């Protein structure tokens, strides 16, 4: 783990998205990210897809806590991209990796481990989009519907 490990003890909203996102959902995701940022809500996500990366950018413009879950090995402290170092130093960003530290590139298996980690460690789940036939939807079997929100 890199960053403030006490963030794991906070109430968290998990954000994930299917790869295919309807254009109408994009602005809803940006608005949601802005609202979470302004309300100071701790958001946990993989932030891998372009939409998820945009959401991370919106979130890091605020001061609320963010937990970034990688599906690959962690960076070394020096290897963390400069855009994220200030948030780590300020104690509002935690970067974790629940996968083997030998994994250098994300694959379907490591992405599934990451997504399961986000779902298991967040109190509510928000999806930018959710393909009913996709892997994310399959992971939600047995999860209470009142814990799930789909934006698009």
In which residue ranges do the predicted regions lie?
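Glycine-biased, small-residue-rich flexible motifs in mid-sequence functional cores and linkers
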Residues: 1-152
């Amino acid at each position: 783990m890199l960053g403030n490990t006490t963030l794991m003890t906070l109430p968290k909203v998990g954000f994930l998205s299917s790869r295919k996102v309807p254009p109408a959902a994009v602005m809803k995701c940006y608005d949601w990210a802005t609202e979470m940022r302004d309300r100071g809500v701790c958001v946990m996500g993989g932030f891998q897809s372009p939409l998820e990366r945009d959401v991370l950018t919106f979130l890091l413009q605020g001061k609320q806590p963010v937990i970034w879950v990688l599906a690959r090995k962690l960076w070394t402290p020096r290897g963390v991209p400069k855009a994220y170092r200030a948030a780590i130093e300020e104690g509002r960003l935690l970067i974790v990796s629940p996968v083997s530290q030998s994994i250098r590139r994300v694959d379907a298996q490591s992405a599934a481990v990451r997504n399961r980690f986000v779902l298991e460690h967040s109190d509510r789940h928000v999806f930018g989009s959710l393909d009913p036939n996709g892997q994310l939807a399959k992971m939600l079997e047995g999860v209470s519907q009142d814990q799930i929100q789909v934006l698009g």
